[in-house]
């Protein structure tokens, strides 16, 4: 069984990491169900295990070093953070590349509900859209596993302040832009996105 948690208030980043670490230990001990946590963070940057100082253009916001995969990314209001704590071993899916591809398929299927056509890129992990001939990232992935239990996850741009990305080179990729569901001309309440995320989740996971 997968539990779903939706947090309405902005969640402190360090608190979120501690929460996930506690939860995955409980999942490992069979004392808790798997969890999908939908939330938003206050404006900040996170630096994954591959991050380098060269990817910081200007320190506009606080930077948090974290153990997830990837480089620098932005989190803030209007961005739907999706943290997944899933036991891949119990699901007989001990394949990290398969898991990442399934995350991509999930988000692509969600975006179709908004008439947005995303594409998963294995060489530039995440979901991208073609915006008038320009490739722009709409969802960033950063995951970590412990004893084949996942944590961290996806940052899907719903309606964030995209100007905050100017302080970093997102995911270490120069020459590419970022976009959001709102930026692509879609007006919808956040709860609609959450409902679609849940509906499409069970078709893949």
From Swiss-Prot:
Enzyme active site: 171 (acyl-thioester intermediate)
Residues under site feature: Lowers pKa of active site Cys: 137
Gene: lipB
Protein name (record): Octanoyltransferase
Major subcellular location class: cytoplasm
Compartment(s) where it occurs, according to its Swiss-Prot or TrEMBL record: Cytoplasm
EC top class, as a word: transferase
Species, as recorded: Wolbachia sp. subsp. Brugia malayi (strain TRS)
Annotated ranges, domain BPL/LPL catalytic: 30-205
